[in-house]
C-alpha cells in the first residue's frame, strides 16, 4: 500500500495528456459497422453486457500526482475555488420511465386508498417532495423510441391501449404528458421530456414542443387548451431521443444520420421557443464499439444546435465486472470520472474543429447500480400491464457505490449540469411500493443526503489517502487498468448565503476504520449540525417491507468544529458531515 495524493476539483478542461492519448489510440470504427453486424435482440444484448465488463480505470487526476510511500491518516485540504459558480441542482435529478411498475403502481395508482383524486400515490409523492428532487426525466428511456405522445393526452376514456415494443408491455396511456406535468407540480420538481427519435418524425417532435410551450393560436397549442391546460407548460429541458446508437433501440440510427435529424429538429424547435435546452444522444456507454466515435460524429452534425450531450452508465458487482470483489466494486465511481472526462474531451475537440464559441455541458441522465434484474423475465413484460421488471434489491455495498457516484457527479459539476439517478420508484430505484406503502432501499440514503446537504458550490480539495491496488487479476484486460485507488473519496460543498458547508466521504476500506483530517484554508466551520454514516457489518444486507431498517443511517461521533477537524470513518461506510459557518 502507498499514500496517494490527488487533487479533487470540479472539471475544468484537460488536466492530463493521458485523456487525449486514449482518444487518439482508440481503434476507429467506420460509421455503420455496428449496424452491419447480425441483429441483436435487446434482452440478449442487455444480458451480455455483464460479460463485457465496465471500463474501470484510475482517473487521469489520480495518475502520477505525488505518490508517497508512507502510511497514516488521510488528509483533505479544502479551499474555495475563486470565481466558481454554484453547481446546478439538476445534477441530482432522477428518472421515471414507462417501464415495469415505475409509473403504474409506482407514482400512479387510481383506486388505491393511497391515491389522491388524480390517481397519484400520496405516499410516493410525499417521499419525492421531501427529497426535493430537482428534475425528473420522462417518459424514457427505451420506451420513448416507440412512443406516440398524442396517445397519452386528452380524455382518458379515449386514450388507446398499445403494446410497448421496447419492454413488451401493455401501455394504457392513462398517465401521459399532462399528468406528468401535474405530478411534477405536486412534488415540486422540473420536467425533462424525452422525444421519440426512433419511430417518431421531426415533425412530431416539433409538434410536441408546440403543444407544451406555445401559448395559443396554433393547432397543437390549442389542442392543449382543449385538454384543459390554458397556460403552456414551459418545459425547458428536452432529450432528443434515447440511446440511438444501441442495437436494442427501436429505430436505431447511424451517428451522422442521427446528428442530422437532431440538427433539423433543434432548429425548428428553437423557432417555437429559443430558450430551450436540448440534449443530444451521446454513446450509450463505454462498452459500445463506437464509443466516443459516435459522440464525435453526432456533434460534427449538430454541435451549434444543441446544448448538452447525454451519458449513460450502469455498474454491478459480478464475476465478470469485478470478480465479485467489494473493493473493486467500490472503486467503480472512478470509472464514471474517467467517462465524464473522455466525453468532455470529445465535446471540446468538436468545439475546436468548428471554431464554436459554445461549450457544451453534459447530461448524465442515466446512472445507477444495475446487474441482477438484467435479463430474461426481469426485462420482458410478456404482453402484460405494469409487470415486475428491473426490480433490483439494493444492499449496503450498492448504497456505498451510489455515494461514490454522487461524489463523482458533484466534483465534475462544472461540466455535468444534469444527471438522473435511474430510476425513481420500483424500477432499479431507491423507492419501492406495495399496496400498503413505500420502502426506502439502501441507495435512498446517500442520494437523499446529497439532495439535503450539498448546496452552493463544490470546493477544491487536495487529498492524501492510503491506497489499495486495483489489477485485472485474471479479468478481462479492459476492466481494470493497473493502478492504486484511494481508500477515502471526499467531496465538499459550500453554501455561503446559507452559512453552511457539507462533507460527503466514502471509505472504501472493507475491513478497517480510516481516520480523515480535514484542514480548511479559508473557511471556518463553527459547529457540526449533523454527522451520520451508512455502514454495517454485512455488505450484503438489504431492507425489506418486513425489515425496513436493516440498512439505515447511524449517528457518528461528531468531530470538533474548526479549521482542522478529524473524522473516524467506519469501515465500509459513506458519511455526511453538515457544518454551520
Regions found by a protein language model. Name each.
Residues 380:
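Acidic/histidine-rich catalytic cores and adjacent linkers
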Residues 313-328, 377:
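Active-site His/acidic residue clusters
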Residues 305-311, 326-331:
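Active-site cores of enzymes that catalyze phosphoryl transfer or operate on phosphate-rich substrates
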Residues 1-40, 65-67:
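N-terminal secretory signal peptides
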Residues 41, 46-57, 61-294, 299-308, ...:
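Non-catalytic accessory regions flanking glycosidase/transglycosidase catalytic cores in CAZymes
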Amino acid at each position: 500500500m502507498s499514500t496517494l495524493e490527488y487533487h479533487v476539483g470540479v472539471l475544468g478542461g484537460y488536466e492530463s495528456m493521458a485523456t487525449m492519448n486514449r482518444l487518439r489510440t482508440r481503434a476507429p470504427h467506420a460509421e455503420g459497422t455496428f449496424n452491419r453486424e447480425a441483429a441483436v435482440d435487446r434482452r440478449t444484448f442487455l444480458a451480455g453486457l455483464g460479460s463485457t465488463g465496465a471500463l474501470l480505470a484510475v482517473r487521469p487526476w489520480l495518475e502520477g500526482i505525488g505518490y508517497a510511500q508512507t502510511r497514516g491518516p488521510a488528509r483533505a485540504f479544502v479551499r474555495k475555488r475563486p470565481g466558481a459558480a454554484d453547481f446546478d441542482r439538476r445534477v441530482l435529478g432522477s428518472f421515471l420511465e414507462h417501464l415495469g411498475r415505475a409509473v403504474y403502481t409506482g407514482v400512479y395508482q387510481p383506486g388505491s386508498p393511497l391515491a389522491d383524486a388524480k390517481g397519484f400515490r400520496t405516499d410516493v409523492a410525499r417521499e419525492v417532495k421531501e427529497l426535493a428532487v430537482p428534475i425528473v426525466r420522462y417518459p424514457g428511456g427505451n420506451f420513448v423510441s416507440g412512443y406516440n405522445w398524442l396517445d397519452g393526452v386528452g380524455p382518458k376514456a379515449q386514450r388507446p391501449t398499445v403494446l410497448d415494443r421496447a419492454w413488451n408491455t401493455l401501455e394504457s396511456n392513462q398517465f401521459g404528458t399532462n399528468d406528468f406535468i401535474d405530478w411534477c407540480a405536486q412534488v415540486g420538481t422540473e420536467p425533462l421530456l424525452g422525444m421519440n427519435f426512433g419511430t417518431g418524425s421531426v415533425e412530431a417532435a416539433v409538434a410536441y414542443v408546440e403543444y407544451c410551450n406555445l401559448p395559443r393560436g396554433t393547432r397543437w397549442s390549442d389542442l392543449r387548451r382543449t385538454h384543459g391546460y390554458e397556460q403552456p407548460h414551459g418545459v425547458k429541458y428536452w432529450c432528443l431521443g434515447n440511446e440511438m446508437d444501441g442495437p436494442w433501440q427501436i429505430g436505431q440510427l447511424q451517428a451522422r444520420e442521427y446528428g442530422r435529424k437532431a440538427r433539423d429538429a433543434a432548429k425548428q424547435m428553437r423557432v417555437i421557443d429559443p430558450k430551450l435546452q436540448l440534449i443530444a444522444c451521446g454513446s450509450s456507454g463505454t462498452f459500445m464499439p463506437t464509443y466516443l466515435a459516435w459522440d464525435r460524429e453526432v456533434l460534427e452534425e449538430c454541435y451549434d444546435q444543441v446544448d448538452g450531450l447525454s451519458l449513460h452508465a450502469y455498474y454491478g458487482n459480478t464475476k465478470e465486472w469485478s470478480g465479485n470483489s467489494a473493493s473493486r466494486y467500490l472503486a467503480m465511481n472512478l470509472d464514471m470520472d474517467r467517462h465524464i472526462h473522455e466525453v468532455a474531451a470529445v465535446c471540446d475537440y468538436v468545439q475546436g474543429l468548428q471554431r464554436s464559441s459554445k461549450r457544451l455541458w453534459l447530461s448524465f441522465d442515466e446512472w445507477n447500480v444495475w446487474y441482477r434484474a438484467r435479463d430474461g423475465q426481469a426485462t420482458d413484460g410478456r404482453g402484460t400491464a405494469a409487470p415486475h421488471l428491473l426490480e433490483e434489491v439494493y444492499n449496503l455495498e450498492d448504497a456505498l457505490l451510489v455515494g461514490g457516484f454522487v461524489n463523482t457527479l458533484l466534483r465534475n459539476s462544472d461540466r455535468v449540469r444534469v444527471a438522473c439517478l435511474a430510476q425513481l420508484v420500483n424500477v432499479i430505484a431507491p423507492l419501492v411500493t406495495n399496496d400498503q406503502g413505500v420502502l426506502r432501499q439502501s441507495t435512498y440514503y446517500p442520494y437523499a443526503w446529497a439532495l439535503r446537504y450539498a448546496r452552493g458550490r463544490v470546493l477544491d480539495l487536495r487529498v492524501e489517502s492510503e491506497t489499495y491496488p486495483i489489477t485485472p487479476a485474471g479479468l478481462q484486460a479492459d476492466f481494470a487498468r493497473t493502478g492504486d485507488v484511494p481508500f477515502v473519496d471526499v467531496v465538499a460543498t459550500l453554501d455561503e448565503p446559507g452559512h453552511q458547508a457539507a462533507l460527503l466521504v466514502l471509505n472504501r476500506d472493507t475491513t478497517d476504520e480510516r481516520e480523515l483530517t480535514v484542514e480548511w484554508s479559508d473557511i471556518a466551520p463553527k459547529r457540526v449540525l449533523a454527522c451520520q454514516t451508512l455502514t454495517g457489518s454485512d455488505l450484503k444486507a438489504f431492507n425489506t417491507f418486513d425489515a425496513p431498517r436493516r440498512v439505515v443511517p447511524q449517528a457518528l461521533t461528531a468531530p470538533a468544529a474548526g479549521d482542522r477537524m478529524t473524522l473516524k470513518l467506519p469501515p465500509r461506510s459513506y458519511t455526511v458531515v453538515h457544518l454551520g459557518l
